Amino acid sequence: MNLCLSALLFFLVILLPSGKGMFGNDGVKVRTCTSQKAVCFFGCPPGYRWIAFCHNILSCCKNMTRFQPPQAKDPWVH
């Protein structure tokens, strides 16, 4: 792979939203993570607590019930 293609791939990957996208993201349901009442993301969004790794790159995140930061509120829900 040449350098230009590697750089393009790198920029596309870092521009992906971690956790919640523009219109929300419910995460991925993996059995080992759902047994702990959590879901998998590419990084825990605000208002979620990191528990473990789901596979190699996904993070198992559980919704915080207490002490949620103000950023955890979904701006699209009124």
Curated annotation (Swiss-Prot):
Belongs to the beta-defensin family. Coiled coil: none annotated. Disulfide bonds join C33-C60, C40-C54, C44-C61. Host defense peptide that exhibits antibacterial and antifungal activity. Exhibits antimicrobial activity against E.coli, S.aureus and C.albicans (in vitro). Has high lipopolysaccharide (LPS)-binding affinity, and may thereby be involved in immunoregulation through LPS neutralization. Residues 1-21 form the signal peptide. It comes from Homo sapiens. The lineage of its organism: Eukaryota, Metazoa, Chordata, Craniata, Vertebrata. One of its GO terms (biological process) is antifungal innate immune response. It is found in: Secreted. One of its GO terms (cellular component) is extracellular region. InterPro entries: DEFB136/42. This is Defensin beta 136. Keywords: Antibiotic, Antimicrobial, Defensin, Disulfide bond, Fungicide, Secreted, Signal. It comes from the Eukaryota. The gene is DEFB136. GO terms for molecular function: lipopolysaccharide binding.
